[in-house]
Amino acid sequence: MANKKTNISVVLPVHELVGEDNVKLFNNAMTSVGNQEVKPDSVLIVVPEGSEVYKTLTEMDLTTYGVKTTILENPGGTDFSSQVNYGVSQCKTEWFSILEFDDEYSSKWFKNVVKYKDAHTDVDVFMPIIIDINQKDGGFMGLTNEAVWANSFSDEL
């Protein structure tokens, strides 16, 4: 499938990349973006301002992943939420997806997202979250995303 503009950015918050294992996880996450059948428009890597991780990332060749990638220094808090919020505030696309540095997308993730958002134009937010309910009393048990995440590897929407 030829790549087209998806109008989606990936926001990838990174607090630190210490040790070979974390660098490998980051590379796997970025490779999963680059290996998409339909690529997102850009990746925004958000790091704490003035951090060592900024230096580490600027020394890496981020062009090898095949997606426009920008490193943003978050001038405020260094927690996950503030990094996500800052990244979202810098998006130039209508849609965004949050990728943690130790997670990966299936190769058809964005292809399926584009199909889904095109088929459901009245929806403003897509969240791969399932609310687990106790069948006996209908009470809240928790939130999960594993079933939705695993379904992204399926050909079904």
Please report, for each region that a protein language model flagged, where it lies by residue.
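Cell-envelope/extracellular polymer assembly enzymes that use nucleotide-activated donors
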Residues: T6-V11, S42
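Short, acidic, metal-binding catalytic loop of nucleotide-sugar glycosyltransferases
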Residues: N28-P40
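Short beta-strand/loop segment that forms part of the nucleotide-sugar
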Residues: P40-G50, T70-N74
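Glycine-rich, basic loop-to-helix element that forms the pyrophosphate-binding segment
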Residues: N74-C91
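Short aromatic/hydrophobic "clamp" motif used to bind/position activated sugar donors
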Residues: F96
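The conserved acidic donor/metal-binding loop of glycosyltransferases
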Residues: E100-E104
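Conserved donor NDP-sugar-binding/catalytic core segment of glycosyltransferases
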Residues: F110-L143
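Short, flexible, basic/aromatic active-site loop/helix in glycosyltransferases
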Residues: I129, L143-L157
